[in-house]
Amino acid sequence: MRDKHFYVYILASGIGGALYIGVTNDLVRRVWEHREKTVEGFTRTHDIHRLVYFEQFDDIENAIVREKRMKKWERAWKIKLIEDKNPNWDDLFESLI
């Protein structure tokens, strides 16, 4: 049986741009949905499609807790998290497929 993973991810409209934090059990599919604008809401209206950060979890409960905490963070903390792992704000989506 294949191990199930869950992901907390951050999408950006560009370097230093608008940010979106989400959680999913299928990172490739979910980011693709955002990129293709099949997801209604904030990411669609603000052209947020660049995957700049993600974390993997083994259980959904911990992933949801992390997502909720990150959503409450100050913007500067989110930017530091991104830049510590991805200083150029590269789109990480291509590395997943």
Q: Residues of each region from the PLM?
A:
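GIY-YIG nuclease catalytic motif and its immediate N-terminal context
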Residues: 1-39, 44-68, 85-87, 92-97
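Short arginine-rich
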Residues: 68-82
